[in-house]
Amino acid sequence: MKVLFAITEAEPFVKTGGLGEVGRYLPLALQEQGVEIRVILPQYSSIPRNYLQKMKTIKEFTVPLAWRNQYCGLKELKYEGIHYYFLDNEYYFRRSRCYGDGDEGEQYAYFSRAVLESVRYLPEFKPDIIHCHDWHTALVPLFLKAFYAQDTLYYNIKTLFTIHNLKYQGIFPREVREDVLGLSGELSSSAQLEFYGGVNFMKAGIMHSDQVTTVSPTYAREIQHPYFGEGLHGVIQGRKDSLLGILNGVPRPWPSPTLADKRANRMKLQEQLNFTNNEEIPILSMISRLVEQKGLDLLLHVLDEILALDIRLVVLGTGDAHYEERLQRFAEGYPGKLRVILGYQEELAHRIYAGADIFLMPSRFEPCGIAQMIAMSYGTIPIVRETGGLKDTVRPYSPISGEGNGFTFTDYNAHELLYAIQKAVEMFRNQKDTWQKLQENALSSDFSWNRSAARYRDVYESLYYSS
């Protein structure tokens, strides 16, 4: 069973967010599960030079895109035992950023078409399944039907489309349909692509793939309803029998942290943040984009009350200016209790994950979320809102059964967040044995990529044998 993994990011070549981790770690885990997998992505100019220099050119060809015929260079690099293919076109990918340019629709329509054209030239590899990720590759299933249905090379190729975040759909003016996509006939109809007068790439991926997955079971249920469906809930309801939720994983820290490590990490963090060295004062943390989706409104609404508790809080992240400014003003008003560090530093982030006692993630919605899983892998206890992958990964602690690995609250309400924090702080300070049991539960939680890969392998096999 051969799988071509079409994605726009893969660490260490390019990473702007969690998708880059998926592009690296899921293929590795799938290969361990016996899947013959290869990854294909754009050759961005931002890829580090040491990797660019090691790439081998396989083929140069042209990619049809409506009235255009665009150059494509197909290159290969083997990394960590995985074959990575890179699609080279300086016009589309020699840019200062991966996303956000004005011709993004054309840029990623080209990438989707180039993925399919490259199948002709992959050495000794004809995929049984093409696994597409988010709107940037969502046209692959549609193009496969529109332009390759009569080509015997493409017979029996199945497509799997994974939604990582439904909020970002790739919506463009209606002119894109003919001028960029080159579609006509039934597959160009409004039912296939149209979205309030525009063209919606994500909609095409959902409608035309053989199977749809998203990144947690709860999110798969949520997006079938208007509040979470971002205007596509009706389309998703129409595919509900082909929709599955599979949690992402996180790389396990090595060596696996212990509670003894936790104490040492806590001391290092206190020293770095200039917090008083006091084991009785819990360190709360938040590592996040500072945007409304992540629950910043809830946090700020009750931040005075949180800081009135005998706690310390560190916030690391960057985002909307008004959230940054308000957090900085709070930090000035609570010196020694609140540290706000704007920006993102990988090393500091992992020191916070490892050294803090409590991790806050009060998101309005969260397709999967990886921060809470990273925190638990270090024995840091999450407080989360019950939504998406947060609900699937964080189980509220039960003092009766001794089961559970964190604290949760249901409604998007600031005082529910405050109550959960008060409850956690009280347990930390007054129920030491219970807190230690909670930490042990968090440390033993399985969020490995191997678990995710086993589920995807089952999906691949189902598609493969349905031919």
From Swiss-Prot:
Pathway noted in the entry: Glycan biosynthesis; glycogen biosynthesis
**Gene3D superfamilies xrefs:** Glycogen Phosphorylase B
**Organism's domain of life?**
Bacteria
Question: Could you give a single Gene Ontology term from the biological process aspect?
Answer: glycogen biosynthetic process
**Which organism is this protein's natural source?**
Desulfitobacterium hafniense (strain DSM 10664 / DCB-2)
GO MF annotation list: alpha-1,4-glucan glucosyltransferase (ADP-glucose donor) activity; alpha-1,4-glucan glucosyltransferase (UDP-glucose donor) activity
The record's similarity note reads: Belongs to the glycosyltransferase 1 family. Bacterial/plant glycogen synthase subfamily.
Q: Which Pfam families match?
A: Glyco_transf_5, Glycos_transf_1
The organism that produces this protein has a lineage beginning with: Bacteria, Bacillati, Bacillota, Clostridia, Eubacteriales
* The protein, known as: Glycogen synthase
**Residues binding ADP-alpha-D-glucose, per UniProt:** K15
